[in-house]
């Protein structure tokens, strides 16, 4: 009834989408729709809950980031309605590389963290670092867990190889489990982590609210215990078990 009063022009067929108004041009409407798509993909999906807040801090405000991300998708001709989660991660990291190349190591690791919180990916993402330097230590960790059951309650009937298949252990250069504001402060100070952080993802004990895997910061066997090959790094910054359940279900 008020369409004429407000100068609203809309499609004549359902769902009667607004094309423009007295205050918003057609171009403005299209721009807002593209921003809405980015918000749906990267915020409302709750699949990027650690990467997005840190990347967003590099922009004046959230709208500025989603607006620029929408332009990036449009200019590159990327698909918005793709079912592949890895595709969305890859595009977001490409966008981050363009906007803030100095933070890429952290952004990549936050993407890996977000991905493994959601699923025990059988195919390792292309943006994840090579885990071969820690192979022996990871194997040794699961062998010790089979004996002592320190981090995985409820897995008593499974042996080491089964534990390794059913869960995931990732070694990060950054303490990705920390709050976004802590990581943002580290970035702003130009701080480089001196130690690695090993995080265990437990998919049988998920957070009831978010459906994310339960996580624990764990201690990997030392080089002497695991007998790694020359040049392998160790994880020295072990902390107590934590049960973070950040993010939300698909």
Give names to the regions the model predicted.
Residues 1-65:
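A structural motif corresponding to the C-terminal lobe/cap of the Radical SAM core domain
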Residues 37-250:
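Radical SAM enzyme core and accessory elements
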């Amino acid at each position: 009834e008020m369409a004429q009063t407000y100068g609203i022009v809309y499609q004549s067929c359902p769902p009667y989408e607004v094309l423009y108004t007295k205050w918003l041009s057609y171009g403005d409407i299209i721009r807002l729709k593209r921003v809405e798509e980015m918000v749906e993909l990267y915020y409302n999906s709750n699949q990027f809950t650690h990467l997005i807040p840190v990347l967003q801090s590099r922009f004046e405000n959230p709208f500025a980031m989603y607006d620029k991300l929408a332009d990036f998708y449009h200019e590159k001709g990327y698909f918005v309605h793709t079912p592949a989660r890895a595709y969305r991660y890859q595009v977001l990291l490409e966008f981050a590389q363009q906007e803030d190349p100095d933070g890429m190591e952290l952004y990549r690791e936050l993407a890996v963290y977000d991905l493994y919180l959601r699923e025990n990916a059988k195919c390792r993402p292309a943006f994840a670092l090579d885990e071969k330097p820690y192979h022996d230590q990871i194997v040794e960790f699961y062998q010790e867990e089979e004996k002592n059951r320190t981090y995985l309650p409820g897995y008593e009937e499974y042996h080491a190889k089964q534990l390794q298949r059913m869960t995931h252990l990732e070694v990060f250069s950054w303490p990705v489990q920390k709050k976004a504001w802590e990581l943002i402060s580290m970035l702003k100070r130009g701080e480089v982590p001196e130690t690695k952080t090993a995080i265990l993802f437990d998919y049988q004990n998920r957070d009831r609210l978010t459906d994310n895997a339960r996580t624990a910061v764990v201690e990997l066997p030392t080089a002497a215990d695991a007998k790694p090959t020359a040049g392998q790094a160790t994880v020295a910054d072990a902390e107590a078990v934590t049960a973070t359940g950040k993010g939300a279900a698909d």
